[in-house]
Amino acid sequence: MATYNGECWIEEQLKSIIEQKDVDISIFISDDLSTDNTLNICEEFQLSYPSIINILPSVNKFGGAGKNFYRLIKDVDLENYDYICFSDQDDIWYKDKIKNAIDCLVFNNANCYSSNVIAYYPSGRKNLVDKAQSQTQFDYFFEAAGPGCTYVIKKETLIEFKKFIINNKNAAQDICLHDWFLYSFARTRNYSWYIDRKPTMLYRQHENNQVGANISFKAKYKRLGLVRNKWYRKEVTKIANALADDSFVNNQLGKGYIGNLILALSFWKLRRKKADKIYILLMLILNIF
């Protein structure tokens, strides 16, 4: 669990993890030098659940959830666990979240798992966030498998990712979104990934979300800005370069508008959701990407 100034929500988040059914868990927390009461709340939980909760020593400022999660992956000894989950600080997990994920991994003989979620707003409004469309040939270059807080990964797979980010420190640290990067790593290394249609948690939405659900007009407008200012393209390129991928996509990224037009000819292979396929087609043709 990566935390930063989450005092309003972290107690509910921790309770929902501790109350998971039919699994034995350990929680490792890395706090990014919070300036509110987050760390104190975590320490109080640690006193109540000393065999479950472990708080990593505070080090330098990470400045974002991605680098904080990279720190957790590198510093936690993964060998003693069968499966590893990522947790945000502000969500509510359904009580069977982890057990359901493990059952799906076993039944489908998969290495990695993610799921749909229910976006949960301060007003009480709820919306399904559907990420479970069929995976495409190159979707992993352009999107994550879903919210990282739904990821459940077999130990052996995450250990390989851990080795990779340790051996490629500079490249890995430069990639903002750990969940997108892990999905790309898994797919390029032929690890099987199962995306569950069943929602497994309430995905809390508030003004401090680093990413959040892409449902509202405001959220969509914000993400359009990330495409227009080339942040999105830069992240795609950094992931492709870090993974030393020699695919069709990577070969087009350095060709400017010509490369965009070539990618546009295979637009249906670049995203999972139909609307997102059309969206990226337009971004490529209009040279916004």
Curated annotation (Swiss-Prot):
Transmembrane segments: none annotated. Keywords: Glycosyltransferase, Lipopolysaccharide biosynthesis, Transferase. Its EC number is 2.4.-.-. It is an enzyme of class 2 (transferase). It comes from the Bacteria. InterPro entries: Glyco_trans_2-like (IPR001173), Nucleotide-diphossugar_trans (IPR029044). SUPFAM superfamilies: Nucleotide-diphospho-sugar transferases. GO terms for molecular function: hexosyltransferase activity. It holds the Pfam family Glycos_transf_2. Pathway: Bacterial outer membrane biogenesis; lipopolysaccharide biosynthesis. GO terms for biological process: lipopolysaccharide biosynthetic process. PANTHER family: GLYCOSYLTRANSFERASE (PTHR22916), UDP-GLCNAC:BETAGAL BETA-1,3-N-ACETYLGLUCOSAMINYLTRANSFERASE-LIKE PROTEIN 1 (PTHR22916:SF3). Belongs to the glycosyltransferase 2 family. This is dTDP-rhamnosyl transferase RfbG. It comes from Shigella flexneri.
